[in-house]
Amino acid sequence: MTQKLDTLQAAIERVIGDRIVHLVRDRGELTLTVKATDYAAIGKTLRDHPDLGFEQLIDICGVDYSGYKDGGYEGLRYAAVSHLLSVQHNWRLRLKVFAPDDDFPLVASLTPIWSGANWFEREAFDMYGIVFDGHTDLRRILTDYGFIGHPMRKDFPVTGHVEMRYDPEQKRVIYQPVSIEPREITPRIIREDNYGGLH
C-alpha cells in the first residue's frame, strides 16, 4: 500500500506540478487541493493522463468549514470534495477545491469530465448552495422546490424556516412558520417501591 501511494504521489507531483495547492497524505489516503481556476482542467488531466487514469468519479460532496476547529478556522468557507478511483491502477484520490467567494460559492462543474457528477453536484448545490458552473441541470434534488436556504450550512437553523402539513379544509399541503411546542427535557424517573433493595 505504501509503495502504491508513493507511486501515485510522485505521479501527481510530476503531472500536476505547480498547480498543486496542497497534497496531503494521511491515513493511507491522498488529498489533492487545487485552485478553483484549475479545478476542471486538473480533473480532465487526472482522468486522461495514462500515469494517473482516474476514469471513475465515486462521489462529490459539499463541505462548510465555518464551524471547523470550533470556529478557529480562517480559510475559505465552502469546498467541493470529489473522490476518484482508478480501476486500471487500483488507487484512489480525494480532490478538493475551495470556492473563492463565500457569498456566492462557485466552482466549475465536473459533469463534462465525469457524467456521474450530475446528481452529486445537484446535491451539493441543494444542501450547501455551491453553484457548479457549466452544469446543465443544476436544480434541487433532495429538498422541495419551494425550500428556502441550504440545510447543511452551519448557519441554517436546526428547526428550519417553515414546516409543511396537510390542511384538510384546503385539501392540499400548505407551508407555515415553524411551530415548536416547548417540552420538558428532564427525563422522568420511575422507581418501584423496593428499587435497589431500599425501603
Swiss-Prot record:
Q: What's an example of a GO molecular-function annotation for this chain?
A: NADH:ubiquinone reductase (non-electrogenic) activity
Which family does the UniProt entry place this protein in? Belongs to the complex I 30 kDa subunit family.
PROSITE patterns cross-referenced by the UniProt entry: COMPLEX1_30K
Q: Which NCBIfam families match?
A: NuoC_fam (TIGR01961), PRK06074.1-1 (NF004730)
Listed under subunit, the entry gives: NDH-1 is composed of 14 different subunits. Subunits NuoB, C, D, E, F, and G constitute the peripheral sector of the complex.
GO CC aspect terms: plasma membrane
- Biological role stated in the UniProt entry: NDH-1 shuttles electrons from NADH, via FMN and iron-sulfur (Fe-S) centers, to quinones in the respiratory chain. The immediate electron acceptor for the enzyme in this species is believed to be ubiquinone. Couples the redox reaction to proton translocation (for every two electrons transferred, four hydrogen ions are translocated across the cytoplasmic membrane), and thus conserves the redox energy in a proton gradient.
For the protein in the UniProt heading, the enzyme class is translocase
Which transformation does this protein catalyse, written as a reaction?
a quinone + NADH + 5 H(+)(in) = a quinol + NAD(+) + 4 H(+)(out)
The record's listing under HAMAP family reads: NDH1_NuoC
Q: What is this protein called?
A: NADH-quinone oxidoreductase subunit C
Might you give the EC number(s) for this enzyme? 7.1.1.-
Taxonomic source organism: Leptothrix cholodnii (strain ATCC 51168 / LMG 8142 / SP-6)
List keywords of the entry alphabetically: Cell inner membrane, Cell membrane, Membrane, NAD, Quinone, Translocase, Transport, Ubiquinone
Q: What is its main location?
A: membrane
Matches recorded under InterPro entries: NADH_DH_suC (IPR010218), NADH_quin_OxRdtase_su_C/D-like (IPR037232), NADH_UbQ_OxRdtase_30kDa_su (IPR001268), NADH_UbQ_OxRdtase_CS (IPR020396)
User: What membrane topology is given?
Assistant: Peripheral membrane protein
Q: Where in the cell is it found?
A: Cell inner membrane
Q: Which Pfam families match?
A: Complex1_30kDa
